Amino acid sequence: MAEQKRDYYEVLGITPDADQSEIKKAFRKLAKKYHPDRNNAPDAAKIFAEINEANDVLSNPKKRANYDKYGFDGVDGEPAFNFQADVFQSFFEEIAKSGVFNNQTNPEQKEKKKRYHWFSKKPKQEQPEINLDHVVEQTIKKVQQNQNQNKDPDELRSKVPGEVTASDWEALVGDTRYGYFDETGDWSWKGYFDEQGKWVWNEPVDSETSEVSVEPEPTPVAPEASFEEAQPEINAEPEASFESTPTPEPVAPEASFEEAQPEPTPIPEPIPTPVQVQPLLLDLNLFTIPTKATKDDLLFDNINLTTYEQVVDYLNSQATPNLAKTDGELQTIDGTNPLLLEQCKKIKKQAEQLFKKLFLKKQLPFITQPEVVEESKTSFDENNVNLVYFEKVPEILFINQQPKEVKYTRQVFDGLTNKTTSETITLEIQLLQTPKETVSAIFKGFGNDHGKGCGDLKIVFEKIKSPFFQVNEDGLHSACIIDPLVAYNGGIIDVFGPYTNFQVKVDGEIDINAIMKFEKLGIAKTKRKGDLFVHLYYSSVPKKKLTTNPQVQQFLELLQAEYELLQDNIKSLKYFKNNLVIPKKPLDQQSYQYLSQEPIS
């Protein structure tokens, strides 16, 4: 089993919001400490390579942006240097050039060097002493130069000879015109760079500097995400215990037809192709990522979000001393992803245009507006709610009963410093299939803390209706566009289930508006609603020769875009699980919180 990597920020001992100067400072300090020539520990070389790997990613704006968004998956495909070959070699080259260790390990060579200076006819010039700190600085510069070779030409700003800017500060280390090495071996500057990047001397000198405008760095571009069809495995720390639903054996779809006319005509049973069904339903626990203020507040275990009742064990910890009523104003956070919302609108618009070509309305005939469901009367006490999290979620996540990651920031008052700080909390909430358009839950003690106790957090999820699926009393309903020639002569058609599509071979003479029934391929975890009903609609234009019907192909692409919404959520969960930190101490309390939902009859 491969050893799990440590978080790059943890390796360098910095926070995720650290700037480039802090990253360089941390790298220099750790590189000097764990360099194999100075540290004889068995794992020094391994730690040194780990430090350089973290610096290689975090010091590169593009790689750092990808790592912050996708974790190790975002940088695994990026070209990287060989740590053993490049980093150590660069250190040894600088050491060899400087002669730091030669003078210490070879007295004869040192004596020869002295005699050479004694008999040299050239006047003796004062040379700055080069120590290991300077070697580390030069190695940082060389590694960053290697990184610059992979950058776009537009990112590399050309320098005018003799021009000094703030971005050149590394090249000036060791230049006695701009600084000197003190008695401790540290480099001291004779001036500084102002906010405009202009060099300013500490004392008046006869040197002119020109002001240069620094171009802003380009915004990092995230790599285009690609999602696999199969469900990714979710790994956790050994201390974490995640319960997952056992995967049933693959079941081949048994298709039968039901006619919409009063007198149905018997149709031969189609021969389905073998299909491996891998349910995407996950039964996972609820955890929060520990921060400085919430480390003692992780009192959650065995979360089971399968009922509409609310049960709460009040939390008592250093982070939440009490749950008294707070005086803070109500704060609302909109966690809706604007890109996801725009993608859902685009899918719906293109689907409506296709339905019009099929002589249908703006939606499929079997999709109807759900009946208004009255809010269930719960024991929710919203008097202490001072933080509301709202997010629009695609309906396909509810249909597949997916966990949903909720990441928000709250305000926490520190009684020791009398200051209010911000902390980020990540919750994972199980979504359930429900006729409601909106579901909500209240989490005690997860709101803002203004000094008089932590308030409560209210989470509200609103469905983004799917134009292709609907859950009715008898099961899950979807659609299929079929070419008229295939319907008459028979062939292979694409059928769409709750989380993937599969191909089925059908015989000819299929009437329009026929219904195919697939047992146990609907929504899992239910017995009465476990079937899938596929409504067949003719395309308005037939295919030409051996080409694919354009309307059938367009419908397939739209459904694939709908499935990508589901795969995107799964990928986000995988990243969350891989970076999950679980406290090693046994949990002495539990807190159970359930979504407010009507029971499914």
Swiss-Prot record:
- Give me the ranges of the annotated region Disordered: 143-163, 205-272
> Tell me, what is an example of a GO biological process annotation in this record?
chaperone cofactor-dependent protein refolding
Alphabetized InterPro entries for the sequence:
DnaJ_C, DnaJ_domain, DnaJ_domain_CS, EAGR_box, EAGR_sf, J_dom_sf
Q: Where is the composition biased (Pro residues)?
A: 263-272
Q: Which GO terms describe its molecular function?
A: unfolded protein binding
Q: Which UniProt keywords apply?
A: Chaperone
- Which residue intervals define the domain J in the entry? 5-77
Where composition is biased (Basic and acidic residues), the residues are 151-160
What domain of life does the UniProt record list for this protein's source? Bacteria
Q: Which Pfam families match?
A: DnaJ, DnaJ_C, EAGR_box
Where is it found, in Gene Ontology cellular component terms? cytoplasm
UniProt cross-references to CDD domains, sorted A to Z:
DnaJ
User: SUPFAM superfamilies under this entry?
Assistant: Chaperone J-domain
- Matches recorded under NCBIfam families: EAGR_box
Q: What is this protein called?
A: DnaJ-like protein MG200
Q: Which organism was this protein described from?
A: Mycoplasma genitalium (strain ATCC 33530 / DSM 19775 / NCTC 10195 / G37) (Mycoplasmoides genitalium)
